[in-house]
Amino acid sequence: MVYIDPKHLELEDRVVAINRVTKVVKGGRRLRFAALVVVGDKNGHVGFGTGKAQEVPEAIRKAIEDAKKNLVEVPMVGSTIPHEVIGVFGGGRILMKPAVEGSGVAAGGPVRAVLELAGVADITSKSLGSNTPINVVRATVEGLKQLKRAEEVAALRGKSVEEIIG
């Protein structure tokens, strides 16, 4: 995975989930907050991160910092993805299909956040497994990592791009 420097990108962030987690100790319960945040430049770069802290804003800040360290590049054809892909992480399975221009983002919840911040404007997706936000986000990003441009596929097969496209 190639490191993408977040300093050169204009990143937007979106909080996907905030969880209240409790640790039971002898004196009672200790409350903390866990935040899941997605960042992206709406131009082919997206990442996610998690953060935990005693206060919600601090957890979000940590999650944003973490997300900036985990940026991935998303290959795109116009405003959609180059081919169909299934992203899997844990129990989360996300099917993503390219869509014609103007159809918009047909995705729910955490998947929509990832795809919109990646800059994918036209796509159809379906969540096939777990609906836990962290697994869904990770599965979506795994799917986006699997995407290949026509040039990459042609090079792997030892053919020209024209032969691949058809």
From Swiss-Prot:
Domain S5 DRBM as annotated: residue spans: 11-74
One of the record's GO molecular function terms: rRNA binding
Gene3D superfamilies registered for this protein in UniProt: 3.30.160.20, 3.30.230.10
InterPro entries for this protein: Ribosomal_Su5_D2-typ_SF (IPR020568), Ribosomal_uS5 (IPR000851), Ribosomal_uS5_bac-type (IPR005712), Ribosomal_uS5_C (IPR005324), Ribosomal_uS5_N (IPR013810), Ribosomal_uS5_N_CS (IPR018192), Ribsml_uS5_D2-typ_fold_subgr (IPR014721)
Cellular component per GO, a single term: small ribosomal subunit
PROSITE patterns: RIBOSOMAL_S5, S5_DSRBD
Transmembrane segments: none
Organism superkingdom: Bacteria
Keywords: Ribonucleoprotein, Ribosomal protein, RNA-binding, rRNA-binding
GO biological process, alphabetically ordered: translation
UniProt free text on domains: The N-terminal domain interacts with the head of the 30S subunit; the C-terminal domain interacts with the body and contacts protein S4. The interaction surface between S4 and S5 is involved in control of translational fidelity.
Subunit structure: Part of the 30S ribosomal subunit. Contacts proteins S4 and S8.
Known function: With S4 and S12 plays an important role in translational accuracy. Located at the back of the 30S subunit body where it stabilizes the conformation of the head with respect to the body.
NCBIfam families from the UniProt entry: rpsE_bact (TIGR01021)
Family membership: Belongs to the universal ribosomal protein uS5 family.
Listed name of the protein: Small ribosomal subunit protein uS5
